[in-house]
Swiss-Prot record:
Part of the 50S ribosomal subunit. SUPFAM superfamilies: Ribosomal protein L29 (L29p) (SSF46561). The lineage of its organism: Bacteria, Thermotogati, Deinococcota, Deinococci, Thermales. InterPro entries: Ribosomal_protein_uL29 (IPR050063), Ribosomal_uL29 (IPR001854), Ribosomal_uL29_CS (IPR018254), Ribosomal_uL29_sf (IPR036049). It comes from Thermus thermophilus (strain ATCC 27634 / DSM 579 / HB8). One of the proteins that surrounds the polypeptide exit tunnel on the outside of the subunit. One of its GO terms (biological process) is translation. This is Large ribosomal subunit protein uL29. The gene is rpmC.
Amino acid sequence: MKLSEVRKQLEEARKLSPVELEKLVREKKRELMELRFQASIGQLSQNHKIRDLKRQIARLLTVLNEKRRQNA
């Protein structure tokens, strides 16, 4: 993932409410589970997608924690 894409994703995530962020994290975790399943049965040809998705989840959780600290 390019740096400009990461920055754009962070900007969009920071605009979301904590509830929306939690929903997005759940969706990404479900997607990660599906990718891991595909990898385990040999259907996933692009293994880098798992790593990228894990990083996206981490970024979303970071933004979510930032918002929670601001409201505390």
